[in-house]
């Protein structure tokens, strides 16, 4: 609690987490069409089949119940930095991920700290470009919904 309040020299120095779009229930899901529904939130029925048999996503639910347009974190709180786990990146199978981890110790090092050249030296330019694009937010994400994780498009 002291770190959350920035008391007695304690503080949060970084705040990393999964991009919400990758979550299993981020967007509303049409049970009839069997797919997540993109578009202006909140979604209360499927625009394709007009069904109201939907599983409402977290993003859409927040739009319905929010009481403010924006929120503000305390000035001492670091920003929330979205990350995309290696397992979500196309072209990175278990062997490639193991190779990266054996060379660089932790996924956090790979996702946030290493240079493109360091990554490229171990797994090649194509994979290094994917990791760096994900780090910089230069990837398109197909939102998850209805119990299915989102994915890089």
Question: What are the language-model segments listed below?
Answer:
Residues 1-153:
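Charged catalytic cores and adjacent phosphate/nucleic-acid-binding surfaces used
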């Amino acid at each position: 609690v002291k770190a959350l309040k920035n008391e007695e020299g304690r503080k949060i120095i970084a705040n990393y987490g999964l991009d919400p779009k990758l979550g299993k229930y981020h967007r509303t899901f049409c049970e009839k069409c069997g797919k997540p529904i993109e578009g202006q939130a909140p979604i209360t029925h499927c625009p394709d089949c007009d069904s109201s048999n939907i599983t409402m996503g977290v993003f859409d639910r927040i739009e319905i119940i929010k009481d403010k347009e924006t929120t503000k974190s305390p000035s001492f709180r670091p920003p929330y930095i979205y990350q995309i786990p290696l397992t979500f990146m196309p072209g990175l199978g278990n062997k490639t991920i193991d190779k990266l981890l054996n060379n660089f110790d932790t996924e956090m090092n790979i996702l946030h700290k290493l240079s493109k050249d360091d990554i490229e030296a171990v797994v090649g330019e194509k994979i290094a470009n994917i990791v760096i694009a994900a780090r910089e937010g230069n990837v398109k994400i197909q939102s998850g919904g209805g119990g299915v994780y989102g994915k890089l498009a």
